[in-house]
Amino acid sequence: VIIIDFGSQYTQLIARKIREQNVFSEILPHNASLHSIMAHEPKAIILSGGPSSVYEKTAPSYDKEILDLDLPILGICYGLHILAQHHGGCVESTGKGEYGFANISVNGGSQLLNSVSNGSRVWMSHMDRVTKIPDGWSVIAESSNNVAAAMASVDSKRLATQFHPEVSHTEYGHQILKNFLFDISKCKPDWTRSEERRVGKECRS
């Protein structure tokens, strides 16, 4: 799994949480080319959060062809905004932001939230929100203040959460990442730390 880093304080945590599921993950910078990403032969891509706003001229650059790959893509927070904007949705400032715990209503319709209880607690940390859902997408969870907490495309290849499933504050975060890795992306839990050390030794020899 390739994680594209847009400057989130939690990017390393995403990588760690994936590896804890015995799936190899690697972090690449936001300006990584499509060619360099595909050289890793990823099963899936995760777009991290970040402090920027997608509608600003100073927003991090990225290869937009990545978003059209025939691979499952999960956008987290800022990653959700990238996917929404790319597919024709609207992202705007909330004016005051949303930081801290929130409870979500699960609407169903996506494997991403399988086994996630209605009303469960999540961790929000964002200044922007999606105000227009892209055509061909649906809101699969909402927060108590009617923010789209999670979205999915009709083909289920594009998924996104406004909250952070990688942090321990999100009650079912582990389950959500597990759903994305195994039910949606069809990853196999066959990676171990010893495998990483073995490859590292081969590269140095």
Model features per residue range: what roles?
Residues 1-44, 51-54, 61-69, 85-201:
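RNA-binding accessory domains that recognize and position tRNA/RNA substrates
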Residues 75, 79, 84:
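Gly/Ala-rich beta-loop-alpha elbow adjacent to hydrolase catalytic centers
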